[in-house]
Regions:
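Hydrophobic h-region of N-terminal signal peptides that target proteins for export
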Residues: 9-16
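Short, acidic/small-residue loops that bind anionic groups at enzyme active sites
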Residues: 148-171, 180-186, 310-312
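ATP/nucleoside-binding phosphotransfer catalytic cores, i.e., glycine-rich phosphate-binding loops
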Residues: 287-347
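Internal helical hairpin/lid segments
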Residues: 243-297
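Short Gly/Thr/Asp-enriched flexible loops that form oxyanion-binding sites at enzyme active sites
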Residues: 135-154, 297-298
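Conserved anion/nucleotide-ligand pocket segment
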Residues: 179-240
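ATP/NTP phosphate-donor binding region
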Residues: 25-126
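Positively charged n-region of N-terminal signal peptides that target proteins for export
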Residues: 1-4
């Protein structure tokens, strides 16, 4: 028996030795950018943001990843005064009767708590910038409850986020003068953002020239206009809710995450039917990630592009990926000779 036991252990060891190495589990939060470095993750955000005080708040899903907290620490090490709102990292699992969505990782605390933090961050006169901890699901619910009369108009205050936060950015574009909307990285994105993208973020916020970035024409043509940037499915949600998103004369940058080709096609057709693209100067399709239908999505976009009757491009670095160039939605973008640039802001 002893001999058989030893033999069995040797056989198991041999099988395990020949087995492929276990692959790392994909981060459940698609907004988290995982650093490829094996060393301790660190990013230098000193002098990146043109402010002294930054507020961090959670408008939607609970930021469960450790990367979200690490992002806060990186801001602190960047010599910013960081005000983390009281409920930012409150785990909904510790509360009774909270929204525990069946889809893992998208639970959120009650909207009343999120709303309280939102008001607190916004109306704090010391806060010069608000960065969302993450998106997920829940911004639409928050916006349904916001009393805009309780928010001060702060056109110089930067409000940054993307993904589900696209909804808030759309509302800020509609309500011009409330804040300076920026489609850009959130707490979980900070930890793995490449140095080149951090430089691009700094230049975008400071008004310096950004680019050029090479893009691929689907419908050729030069164009210019202020940027409107966000998540495809949230643009569709906003239009269905009758948000008055100002796209006339602007360049629309669109990204997607966890979408099938059929869903992309339907959302694009719906947006066209709802006149989202009417009067736009151009459209740029960015990254579509976390999908097994990348080629099919590319085909859908290629077939859809000519129907818009305006210049259409693909390949700009924006979305749920490390290649994430933040975009200030108050700044003008230009596309010329298949290159995207944001000209320096005249002061």
């Amino acid at each position: 028996m002893k001999y058989l036991l030893i033999l069995s252990l040797l056989l198991v060891s041999a099988v395990l030795a020949g087995a492929p190495a276990r692959q790392p589990v994909q981060e459940s939060d698609p907004e988290v950018i995982v650093s490829k470095s094996k060393k301790k993750v660190t990013r230098d955000y000193r002098n990146v943001f043109p402010v002294k005080t930054i507020a961090v708040t959670t408008p939607a899903s609970y930021p469960h990843s450790g990367a979200n907290r690490l992002g806060v620490e990186m801001l602190k090490k960047g010599n910013y005064k960081v005000k983390v709102m009281p409920h930012t990292f409150l785990d909904p699992a510790t509360l009774k009767n909270t929204n525990r969505k069946a889809h893992k990782g998208y639970a959120s605390i009650p909207v009343e708590m999120r709303l309280e933090d939102f008001y607190k961050a916004w109306n704090d006169p010391e806060v010069e910038m608000i960065i969302c901890s993450r998106g997920g699901n829940g911004c639409f619910e928050l916006l349904e409850k916001i009393d805009w009369n309780k928010l001060k108009k702060r056109p110089e205050m930067i409000f940054m986020g993307y993904s589900d936060v696209t909804l808030i950015l759309c509302k800020l574009l509609e309500k011009e003068g409330y804040a300076r909307p920026v489609a850009g990285p959130m707490m979980g994105s900070m930890t793995g953002l490449p140095p080149a993208m951090i430089t691009g973020l700094k230049k975008m916020l400071s008004g310096e020239k950004v680019g050029p970035y090479k893009v691929t024409p689907l419908v050729a043509g030069d164009c210019s206009g202020k940027a409107v940037a966000g998540l495809l499915q949230r643009f569709a949600t906003a239009k269905r809710a009758n948000y008055a998103i100002p796209t006339k004369g602007k360049i629309i940058f669109i990204e997607g995450v966890s979408l099938s080709a059929a869903r992309v096609k339907q959302e694009l057709l719906d947006l066209k039917k709802m006149k989202f693209f009417d009067g736009a100067a151009g459209v740029v399709f960015c990254h579509f990630t976390r999908t097994k239908e990348g080629k099919e999505i590319g085909k859908v976009i290629k077939e859809f592009a000519p129907s818009l009757g305006i210049p259409v491009y693909t390949g700009f670095p924006f979305g749920h990926t490390a290649k994430h160039q933040a975009m200030d939605l108050t700044r003008t973008a230009e596309i010329k000779n298949n290159m995207v640039i944001f000209p320096a802001v005249k002061k």
